[in-house]
Amino acid sequence: MGTPVKILVVLFSVIVLLAVAQSSYLPPCEPVNETVAVEKEGCPKCLVLQTTICSGHCLTKEPVYKSPFSTVYQHVCTYRDVRYETVRLPDCPPGVDPHITYPVALSCDCSLCTMDTSDCTIESLQPDFCMSQREDFLVY
């Protein structure tokens, strides 16, 4: 093996080791405590509460060559097992159901994003964002 090839092999090895080392410092995909806001059309206040959501790093890869005949799938940290809890929103007028149900993450998984249950956008609102007046109510 010539000197340029040896240098490339060493350089490639260093890059691989750095990539592995960096990924070991990223938080894994797991349930974490988060403050979220729940609100409902017709009710004047939103409720801010504590729950668990899925958050963390999932290994992904992007192909160098993108064929028009293949699809690229990126895995995201999303819910595996959930429990649903229901709370009552304050000051809802008569005729508006004051109850709202929200998910509590029990376990998480790196898998394809399901838009029915997850926000998979690049930039979304913060989980505790309210359109209406806030009322803090901490639930664990």
Curated annotation (Swiss-Prot):
Q: Which UniProt keywords apply?
A: Disulfide bond, Glycoprotein, Hormone, Secreted, Signal
* Broad class of where this protein is predominantly found: secreted
The disulfides recorded in the entry are 29-77, 43-92, 46-130, 54-108, 58-110, 113-120
Give the record's GO biological process terms: G protein-coupled receptor signaling pathway
Q: Does the keyword Phosphoprotein apply?
A: no
- Name its cellular compartments: Secreted
The Gene Ontology terms for molecular function here are: hormone activity
Q: Which residues form the signal peptide?
A: 1-23
Residues linked to a glycan: 33
Cross-referenced SUPFAM superfamilies? Cystine-knot cytokines
Which Pfam families does the entry link to?
Cys_knot
InterPro entries, per the entry? Cystine-knot_cytokine (IPR029034), Glyco_hormone_CN (IPR006208), Gonadotropin_bsu (IPR001545), Gonadotropin_bsu_CS (IPR018245)
GO CC list: cytoplasm; extracellular space
| Family in the record | Belongs to the glycoprotein hormones subunit beta family.
- What role does this protein play? Involved in gametogenesis and steroidogenesis.
- Assembly with partners or alone: Heterodimer of an alpha and a beta chain.
Q: What is this protein called?
A: Gonadotropin subunit beta-2
